[in-house]
């Protein structure tokens, strides 16, 4: 993958999640909305696919075996930082874990469990090149004062 990546395919996305049931759900929902969907069970497989395809959006789970979402984000930041703006992190990790994530360079964050319409709307906005609307897409609980 080079730092000057080719233009992305407007409706092509990749879902990176180790849960086969969630991958199947994402395929069904996103294909119904006109997206072409590829899937990867971990960060290593995802990087291989990302290096060969120009995705409009990358849905990324953080907690996976082998190469996790944090490790994939680090590799993308080193090798092709422009792709980070196409990443939508989806996670059920604790707030403490999520707080270690730098959300300034990614498109957004969605907490699991999530509303499927919220996810589809986020993927559509990201793939259309629309900037995220602050605060990032999230169902995270408010901090206690």
Residue ranges and their predicted role:
Residues 34-41, 49:
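Short hydrophobic/Thr-rich beta-strand motif most characteristic of the beta2 strand and flanking loop
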Residues 41-45, 68-72:
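Acidic catalytic/metal-coordinating carboxylates
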Residues 61:
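Active-site residues of response regulator receiver
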Residues 64:
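Receiver (REC) domain active-site loop signature in two-component systems and cognate sites
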Residues 90-91:
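Hydrophobic/aromatic residues positioned on beta-strands within the core alpha/beta folds
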Residues 112:
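A Lys-centered signature of the CheY-like receiver
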């Amino acid at each position: 993958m080079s730092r000057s990546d080719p233009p992305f395919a407007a409706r092509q996305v990749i879902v990176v999640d180790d849960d086969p049931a969630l991958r199947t759900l994402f395929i069904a929902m996103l294909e119904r909305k006109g997206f072409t969907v590829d899937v990867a069970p971990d960060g290593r497989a995802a990087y291989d696919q990302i290096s060969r395809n120009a995705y409009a959006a990358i849905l990324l789970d953080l907690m996976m075996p082998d190469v996790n979402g944090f490790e994939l984000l680090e590799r993308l930041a080193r090798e092709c930082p422009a792709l980070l703006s196409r990443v939508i992190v989806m996670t059920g990790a604790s707030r403490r874990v999520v707080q270690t994530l730098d959300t300034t360079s990614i498109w957004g964050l969605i907490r699991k469990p999530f509303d499927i319409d919220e996810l589809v709307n986020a993927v559509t906005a990201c793939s259309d090149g629309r900037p995220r609307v602050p605060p990032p897409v999230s169902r995270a609980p408010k901090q206690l004062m």
